[in-house]
Amino acid sequence: MPVLNTLRRSLLILALACTLPSLAMDRNALLDQANVLLLPRERAIPQLELVDQNDQPFSTETLKGRWHILFFGFTACPDICPTTLSEMRRLFGQLPAETREQLQLVLITADPARDTPQQLKTYLSYYRAGFIGLTGNMEQLQRLSKALGLPFVPATETEGDYSVSHSGNLALVGPDGSLRGHIRAPLKLDGLQRVLPQILDNER
């Protein structure tokens, strides 16, 4: 009997040794298919005071308690931003309700000279109710940009028809308010639909 028990334990250990790497590979494959890169450890985000699309104060502390997807852009953006928002609208419509309830999309302007709260509110209303827009002074915005790993180059102009160079990636922030990873462009909606519920369930 002791020999039999030892054999059973050995077989169980062997089965786990084979299964765990397989699970890790499956998870990594899902992340790759979704163009998601999770950080090996959380990264703190500085406390900053911004303004939302309703002209109300919005502290980065407000990010706590819920998962957020954040990206930088601007309302006059001709390509990246409308594409990102359209795809995010589609993704939110495809996600399970329980995942959607835990997740919030936030557009942070890289063009505060033109993107007033009212401008952000009007712009976001074309996509999905509940999407948040943030603005603030350039120093605060650049600090947040650096903390999130989403660079943008401030425009030298403040009037007229000008563009702003910015990253097409999105940041994934956990309910503790820390940076957890990035969703890289181009967005892969099928992969995101599969992997986001797992991330939200497993990465508390």
From Swiss-Prot:
Cu cation binds at residues 77, 81, 166. GO terms for molecular function: metal ion binding. Pfam families: SCO1-SenC. CDD domains: SCO (cd02968). Keywords: Copper, Metal-binding. Signal peptide: none annotated. The keyword Metal-binding applies. Belongs to the SCO1/2 family. PANTHER family: ELECTRON TRANSPORT PROTIN SCO1/SENC FAMILY MEMBER, LINALOOL DEHYDRATASE_ISOMERASE DOMAIN-CONTAINING PROTEIN. This is Putative copper-binding protein.
